[in-house]
């Protein structure tokens, strides 16, 4: 299930980054955020039903992110509360980077686990930019767009695809 969600997280991060870099209309940007947010939400509710609470808890951080982005874009909402949510998630990415989701213990430093450390920390950096821009009111310019595209490719699309074909490093 993770590979499926990551594939769509990858494309939505890429599209959100391109939208920012190319000044695409926010309502247009909202559409894929609704799709990805809904997919993530539904699949993570399934994970809760199956008793996989760690996967669901971490996965819903993404689902709510994209649903909130979509709502902000469609309804032109004040972004400050979303910015505080971004800080909450960014802080959580620090310990999550070092927890093995299969054992719920501190990771062994295998190649696959080191990739997950880097992936979680890069996601945390992107969420932190939401707090910096929306709460602290510091415009980070094109950096966020480029970071979103890079995160989309290297932390979601490629890992998601590798998970789907069972080739992600252990």
Label the model's feature ranges.
Residues 53-127:
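Membrane-proximal helix-loop-helix units in multi-pass membrane proteins
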Residues 1-49, 142-147, 162-170:
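N-terminal topogenic module of multi-pass integral membrane proteins
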Residues 3, 7, 16, 29, ...:
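Generic detector of bulky aromatic hydrophobic side chains
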Residues 22-35, 75-92, 111-119, 132-154:
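Cytoplasm-facing juxtamembrane segments at the starts of transmembrane helices
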Residues 19-23, 48, 55, 109, ...:
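Generic alpha-helix detector with strongest preference for long hydrophobic helices that associate
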Residues 14-19, 38-50, 66-73, 91-104, ...:
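Hydrophobic alpha-helical transmembrane segments and adjacent interfacial helices
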